[in-house]
Amino acid sequence: YKQQHVGSNGRKFSPSRNAHYVKYIGEREHVLKFSHESNLVKYMGEREHATRHSDNGLFGYINGSFSDNYSTSEMQNYVRKISTSHRSVFHSIFSFTPESAEEAGLRTLIDWEEWVKFHISDISRNMKMKQENIEYLAAVHLKEGQPHVHIIWWDKAQEILINKINPVICDQIRIDVIKST
């Protein structure tokens, strides 16, 4: 498990960097997407440059509801807007071996979506945030030998910027996720 909310310079991620991260996770190669021809999941080994907004792998919980049909540009604009001076926007990655993903039952995009929905509670609990205030976007990358899920998330009710996260908290998130997977 890896979690960041500041760059190597120690400064919080800018609104444009957070917006770029949305595009990066949703459209990069190896992203897992629903096929448009059927309701089956299809693995995309190469990036497709289609303009339809469903041609990305983004899913998440925004404005009180879950969706797996977000427009990249609309979500980039939304993330830019919520990336205020008083709100921390976190970038998290959960990585697996192919064997551990199989053991966890992560075979389809729906499996991964359910996994993220379930484990957002581990993140919110350890970060001492109310789960109902957490919004997130996520995308699964089936990188050879290292399937993983990127999650960009924030507390929509946050009023004070979080400058530093104790590494023990991130480790506890990792431990809790392992225990409950």
Where are these predicted regions, by residue range?
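N-terminal nicking endonuclease/strand-transfer module with a His-rich metal-binding environment
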Residues: 1-147, 151-181
